[in-house]
């Protein structure tokens, strides 16, 4: 996906990018590749691949959810900033918090935010399990997002405690999400959520399947969740 295709395919979805926003994506790409030589941020470094599999793929969430309001977003395990930084570039009014367990990645994100002159972004070096226990952030975000971090039964325990009641947990998944959804429904329910919508589509050019899950937070998450670091992965909430 070249820059012209990136711009026109977003335009078809009603997302028009200014010259400044296109410049920010270009700087994002350059910074990502430069820092990737020093530390492992991504296996994808070829420009057209980055624009398709990182930038465009992240923004597909906006095809199924309205980001036009000044929402607060928490991105769990964003790594090199996906999906929240591409969304922030497209929708500058979003208030973004990224939680990641690796300090090196947080250093990269701080550098990136300064370089792109992003405001209303915060980067927290923490495990999602401990972050979700903190009173000032627990159940405080309009949206919590995660892209390919863990299976749904695990991911729900990391994300749903952070979503305010009435807010939305957006899980961005690859192919074969059906089985994962079936196995994850119980955890979603236990943690106060309800699966409202699953949107399945093909990423352009390579035709690989993507699934975007919209999970509504219906009631408060029981206080015992999330459990201590590592436990959700070892003992997921499954029937």
Swiss-Prot record:
Protein family membership: Belongs to the methyltransferase superfamily. RNA methyltransferase RsmG family.
Pfam family of the protein (one): GidB
EC number in record: 2.1.1.-
The organism's place on the tree of life at top rank: Bacteria
Localization terms from the record: Cytoplasm
InterPro entries on file: rRNA_ssu_MeTfrase_G, SAM-dependent_MTases_sf
Cellular component GO terms held in the UniProt record: cytosol
UniProt keyword Cytoplasm present: yes
Protein name, per record: Ribosomal RNA small subunit methyltransferase G
The UniProt record lists the keyword Heme: no
PANTHER family per the UniProt record, alphabetical: S-ADENOSYL-L-METHIONINE-DEPENDENT METHYLTRANSFERASES SUPERFAMILY PROTEIN
Keywords: Cytoplasm, Methyltransferase, rRNA processing, S-adenosyl-L-methionine, Transferase
Predominant subcellular localization, coarse grouping: cytoplasm
């Amino acid at each position: 996906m070249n820059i012209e295709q990136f711009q026109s395919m977003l335009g078809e979805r009603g997302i028009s990018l200014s010259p400044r926003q296109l410049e920010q994506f270009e700087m994002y790409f350059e910074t990502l590749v430069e820092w990737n030589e020093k530390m492992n941020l991504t296996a994808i470094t070829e420009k057209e691949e980055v624009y398709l599999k990182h930038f465009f793929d992240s923004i597909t969430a906006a095809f199924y959810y309205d980001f036009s309001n000044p929402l607060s977003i928490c991105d769990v395990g964003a790594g090199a900033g996906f999906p929240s930084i591409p969304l922030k570039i497209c929708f500058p009014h979003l208030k973004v918090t990224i939680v990641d367990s690796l300090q090196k990645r947080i250093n990269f994100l701080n550098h990136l935010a300064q370089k792109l002159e992003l405001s209303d972004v915060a980067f927290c070096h923490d495990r999602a399990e401990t972050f979700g226990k903190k009173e000032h952030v627990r159940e405080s975000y309009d949206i919590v997002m995660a892209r390919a971090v863990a299976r749904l039964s695990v991911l729900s325990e990391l994300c749903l405690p952070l979503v305010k009641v009435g807010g939305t947990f957006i899980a961005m998944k690859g192919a074969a999400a059906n089985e994962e959804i079936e196995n994850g429904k119980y955890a979603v329910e236990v943690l106060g959520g309800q699966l409202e919508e699953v949107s399945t589509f093909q990423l352009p050019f390579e035709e690989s399947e993507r699934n975007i899950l919209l999970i509504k937070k219906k009631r408060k998450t029981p206080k015992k969740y999330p459990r201590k670091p590592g436990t959700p992965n070892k003992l997921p909430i499954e029937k």
